[in-house]
Amino acid sequence: MLDVDKIRKDFPMIENNPDLVYLDSAATSLKPQCVIDAVVDFYARHTSNVHRGDYRVAEINDKLYDGTRNLVAELIHCDKDEVVYTHNVSHSLNQIAFGLKPMLKKGDTVLITYAEHASNVLPWFALQKEIGINIEYIETDNEANITIDTFKKAMHEGVKVVSVAEVTNVLGSIQPVKEMCEIAHSYGAYMIVDGAQSVPHMKVDVKDLDVDFLGFSAHKMCGPYGVGILYGKKKLLDAMEPVF
Protein backbone atom coordinates (compact mmCIF):
# COMPACT_ATOMS: atom_id res chain seq x y z
CA MET A 1 0.00 0.00 0.00
CA LEU A 2 1.21 3.49 -0.84
CA ASP A 3 2.41 5.25 2.31
CA VAL A 4 1.56 8.89 1.60
CA ASP A 5 2.97 10.15 4.90
CA LYS A 6 6.31 8.49 4.19
CA ILE A 7 6.44 10.03 0.73
CA ARG A 8 5.61 13.49 2.09
CA LYS A 9 8.55 13.21 4.49
CA ASP A 10 10.88 12.88 1.49
CA PHE A 11 10.05 16.45 0.47
CA PRO A 12 11.42 19.26 2.69
CA MET A 13 9.07 21.77 1.06
CA ILE A 14 6.12 19.85 2.50
CA GLU A 15 7.83 19.21 5.83
CA ASN A 16 8.47 22.94 6.14
CA ASN A 17 4.90 23.78 5.10
CA PRO A 18 2.79 21.08 6.81
CA ASP A 19 -0.51 22.62 5.72
CA LEU A 20 0.52 22.72 2.08
CA VAL A 21 -1.43 20.71 -0.47
CA TYR A 22 0.64 21.05 -3.63
CA LEU A 23 -1.28 20.71 -6.90
CA ASP A 24 1.09 22.52 -9.26
CA SER A 25 3.40 19.69 -10.35
CA ALA A 26 2.44 20.23 -14.00
CA ALA A 27 4.30 23.55 -13.69
CA THR A 28 7.14 22.24 -11.53
CA SER A 29 7.45 19.34 -9.12
CA LEU A 30 8.75 19.56 -5.58
CA LYS A 31 12.27 18.23 -4.98
CA PRO A 32 12.95 15.27 -2.68
CA GLN A 33 15.78 15.45 -0.17
CA CYS A 34 17.94 13.05 -2.19
CA VAL A 35 17.92 15.43 -5.17
CA ILE A 36 18.76 18.41 -2.97
CA ASP A 37 21.58 16.39 -1.39
CA ALA A 38 22.97 15.44 -4.81
CA VAL A 39 23.10 19.07 -5.93
CA VAL A 40 24.74 20.20 -2.68
CA ASP A 41 27.17 17.28 -2.84
CA PHE A 42 28.39 18.42 -6.25
CA TYR A 43 29.18 21.91 -5.00
CA ALA A 44 30.57 20.74 -1.65
CA ARG A 45 32.56 17.64 -2.64
CA HIS A 46 33.31 17.27 -6.35
CA THR A 47 32.97 20.53 -8.29
CA SER A 48 34.64 20.47 -11.70
CA ASN A 49 33.97 20.85 -15.39
CA VAL A 50 32.98 17.73 -17.30
CA HIS A 51 35.34 16.19 -19.88
CA ARG A 52 37.87 18.96 -19.25
CA GLY A 53 40.07 17.61 -16.46
CA ASP A 54 42.41 14.69 -15.89
CA TYR A 55 42.17 14.38 -12.12
CA ARG A 56 40.10 12.35 -9.65
CA VAL A 57 37.27 14.80 -9.00
CA ALA A 58 36.84 15.49 -12.72
CA GLU A 59 36.73 11.75 -13.41
CA ILE A 60 33.92 11.38 -10.86
CA ASN A 61 31.86 13.97 -12.71
CA ASP A 62 32.65 12.46 -16.10
CA LYS A 63 31.20 9.15 -14.90
CA LEU A 64 28.13 10.81 -13.40
CA TYR A 65 27.54 12.87 -16.53
CA ASP A 66 27.86 9.93 -18.92
CA GLY A 67 26.05 7.58 -16.58
CA THR A 68 23.07 9.91 -16.46
CA ARG A 69 22.98 9.98 -20.26
CA ASN A 70 22.79 6.18 -20.23
CA LEU A 71 19.93 6.27 -17.70
CA VAL A 72 18.00 8.75 -19.84
CA ALA A 73 18.52 6.53 -22.88
CA GLU A 74 17.12 3.58 -20.93
CA LEU A 75 14.15 5.66 -19.75
CA ILE A 76 12.97 6.63 -23.24
CA HIS A 77 14.45 3.61 -25.07
CA CYS A 78 17.01 5.19 -27.37
CA ASP A 79 20.74 5.15 -27.99
CA LYS A 80 22.88 7.26 -25.66
CA ASP A 81 24.23 9.18 -28.67
CA GLU A 82 20.70 10.42 -29.31
CA VAL A 83 20.47 12.16 -25.92
CA VAL A 84 21.39 15.86 -25.78
CA TYR A 85 21.48 17.83 -22.53
CA THR A 86 19.67 21.18 -22.53
CA HIS A 87 18.46 23.67 -19.91
CA ASN A 88 14.79 22.56 -20.05
CA VAL A 89 12.10 21.52 -22.53
CA SER A 90 11.71 25.12 -23.74
CA HIS A 91 15.40 25.15 -24.63
CA SER A 92 15.05 21.73 -26.28
CA LEU A 93 12.18 22.88 -28.51
CA ASN A 94 14.05 26.06 -29.45
CA GLN A 95 17.15 24.03 -30.34
CA ILE A 96 15.07 21.72 -32.53
CA ALA A 97 13.22 24.53 -34.31
CA PHE A 98 16.31 26.58 -35.06
CA GLY A 99 18.36 23.47 -35.82
CA LEU A 100 15.82 22.66 -38.54
CA LYS A 101 15.87 26.22 -39.90
CA PRO A 102 18.31 25.43 -42.76
CA MET A 103 16.04 22.57 -43.84
CA LEU A 104 12.98 24.82 -44.10
CA LYS A 105 12.11 27.45 -46.68
CA LYS A 106 9.52 30.14 -47.30
CA GLY A 107 6.07 28.62 -47.72
CA ASP A 108 6.79 25.41 -45.81
CA THR A 109 4.11 24.61 -43.23
CA VAL A 110 4.49 23.76 -39.54
CA LEU A 111 1.46 22.15 -37.90
CA ILE A 112 0.72 22.80 -34.21
CA THR A 113 -2.44 23.12 -32.10
CA TYR A 114 -4.01 25.97 -30.16
CA ALA A 115 -3.42 23.93 -26.99
CA GLU A 116 0.38 24.10 -27.16
CA HIS A 117 2.57 25.61 -24.45
CA ALA A 118 4.23 28.86 -25.52
CA SER A 119 7.53 26.96 -25.74
CA ASN A 120 6.12 25.08 -28.73
CA VAL A 121 4.65 28.16 -30.36
CA LEU A 122 7.08 31.07 -30.07
CA PRO A 123 10.02 29.39 -31.89
CA TRP A 124 7.76 28.79 -34.90
CA PHE A 125 6.52 32.38 -34.79
CA ALA A 126 10.16 33.46 -34.87
CA LEU A 127 10.86 31.28 -37.92
CA GLN A 128 7.71 32.58 -39.57
CA LYS A 129 9.11 36.09 -39.22
CA GLU A 130 12.66 35.11 -40.23
CA ILE A 131 12.11 32.84 -43.23
CA GLY A 132 8.40 32.98 -44.01
CA ILE A 133 7.16 29.56 -42.96
CA ASN A 134 3.42 29.01 -42.63
CA ILE A 135 1.89 28.02 -39.29
CA GLU A 136 -1.33 26.02 -39.41
CA TYR A 137 -3.39 24.51 -36.61
CA ILE A 138 -4.75 21.01 -36.12
CA GLU A 139 -8.38 21.08 -35.08
CA THR A 140 -9.09 19.76 -31.57
CA ASP A 141 -12.24 19.17 -29.56
CA ASN A 142 -13.25 21.13 -26.45
CA GLU A 143 -10.84 19.05 -24.34
CA ALA A 144 -7.91 19.66 -26.71
CA ASN A 145 -7.96 16.11 -28.12
CA ILE A 146 -6.69 15.46 -31.63
CA THR A 147 -8.48 12.72 -33.56
CA ILE A 148 -6.86 10.82 -36.40
CA ASP A 149 -9.52 12.10 -38.78
CA THR A 150 -8.88 15.74 -37.92
CA PHE A 151 -5.13 15.19 -38.17
CA LYS A 152 -5.47 13.63 -41.61
CA LYS A 153 -7.53 16.64 -42.70
CA ALA A 154 -4.79 18.99 -41.49
CA MET A 155 -1.97 17.18 -43.28
CA HIS A 156 -0.96 18.09 -46.84
CA GLU A 157 2.13 18.00 -49.05
CA GLY A 158 3.32 21.39 -47.82
CA VAL A 159 3.61 20.26 -44.19
CA LYS A 160 7.27 19.79 -43.26
CA VAL A 161 6.98 19.73 -39.45
CA VAL A 162 4.34 18.57 -36.98
CA SER A 163 5.02 19.71 -33.41
CA VAL A 164 2.63 18.80 -30.58
CA ALA A 165 2.58 18.03 -26.87
CA GLU A 166 1.92 14.36 -26.19
CA VAL A 167 0.02 15.46 -23.07
CA THR A 168 -1.32 19.01 -22.82
CA ASN A 169 -0.17 20.97 -19.79
CA VAL A 170 -3.61 22.40 -18.94
CA LEU A 171 -6.19 19.70 -19.68
CA GLY A 172 -4.02 16.59 -19.64
CA SER A 173 -5.31 15.44 -23.03
CA ILE A 174 -3.26 12.54 -24.44
CA GLN A 175 -2.63 12.72 -28.16
CA PRO A 176 -2.30 9.66 -30.48
CA VAL A 177 1.35 10.39 -31.20
CA LYS A 178 2.28 6.99 -32.65
CA GLU A 179 -0.45 7.12 -35.27
CA MET A 180 0.33 10.78 -35.97
CA CYS A 181 3.99 9.93 -36.56
CA GLU A 182 3.05 7.32 -39.15
CA ILE A 183 0.82 9.78 -41.01
CA ALA A 184 3.32 12.66 -40.78
CA HIS A 185 6.14 10.48 -42.09
CA SER A 186 4.00 9.35 -45.03
CA TYR A 187 4.09 13.01 -46.13
CA GLY A 188 7.81 13.32 -45.44
CA ALA A 189 7.26 15.59 -42.43
CA TYR A 190 9.27 15.63 -39.21
CA MET A 191 7.43 14.80 -35.97
CA ILE A 192 8.41 16.78 -32.87
CA VAL A 193 6.92 15.91 -29.48
CA ASP A 194 6.82 18.07 -26.36
CA GLY A 195 7.14 15.39 -23.67
CA ALA A 196 7.17 17.73 -20.67
CA GLN A 197 3.99 16.22 -19.24
CA SER A 198 4.15 12.70 -20.69
CA VAL A 199 7.65 11.51 -19.78
CA PRO A 200 7.17 12.10 -16.01
CA HIS A 201 3.91 10.14 -15.92
CA MET A 202 3.81 7.63 -18.79
CA LYS A 203 5.96 5.02 -20.45
CA VAL A 204 7.48 6.82 -23.44
CA ASP A 205 9.33 4.65 -25.97
CA VAL A 206 10.65 6.92 -28.70
CA LYS A 207 11.52 4.00 -30.96
CA ASP A 208 8.04 2.53 -30.71
CA LEU A 209 6.44 5.94 -31.26
CA ASP A 210 8.94 6.67 -34.07
CA VAL A 211 9.16 10.35 -33.14
CA ASP A 212 11.94 12.33 -34.77
CA PHE A 213 12.51 14.64 -31.80
CA LEU A 214 11.32 14.81 -28.20
CA GLY A 215 12.02 17.22 -25.36
CA PHE A 216 11.37 17.14 -21.61
CA SER A 217 12.50 18.76 -18.34
CA ALA A 218 13.95 17.33 -15.13
CA HIS A 219 12.22 19.90 -12.91
CA LYS A 220 8.79 18.48 -13.75
CA MET A 221 9.79 15.02 -12.55
CA CYS A 222 11.37 15.70 -9.14
CA GLY A 223 14.69 16.75 -10.64
CA PRO A 224 16.58 20.05 -10.38
CA TYR A 225 16.02 23.18 -12.41
CA GLY A 226 18.29 23.83 -15.36
CA VAL A 227 18.34 20.29 -16.74
CA GLY A 228 16.47 19.29 -19.87
CA ILE A 229 16.69 16.59 -22.50
CA LEU A 230 16.51 16.73 -26.26
CA TYR A 231 16.11 13.38 -28.00
CA GLY A 232 16.70 13.24 -31.74
CA LYS A 233 17.19 10.44 -34.22
CA LYS A 234 20.95 10.17 -34.75
CA LYS A 235 20.80 10.74 -38.51
CA LEU A 236 18.77 13.91 -37.97
CA LEU A 237 21.01 15.26 -35.21
CA ASP A 238 24.00 14.72 -37.51
CA ALA A 239 22.25 16.57 -40.35
CA MET A 240 21.17 19.58 -38.27
CA GLU A 241 23.10 22.81 -37.99
CA PRO A 242 24.43 23.43 -34.45
CA VAL A 243 22.65 26.26 -32.65
CA PHE A 244 24.91 28.42 -30.49
Q: Where are these predicted regions, by residue range?
A:
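Pyridoxal 5′-phosphate
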Residues: M1-F244
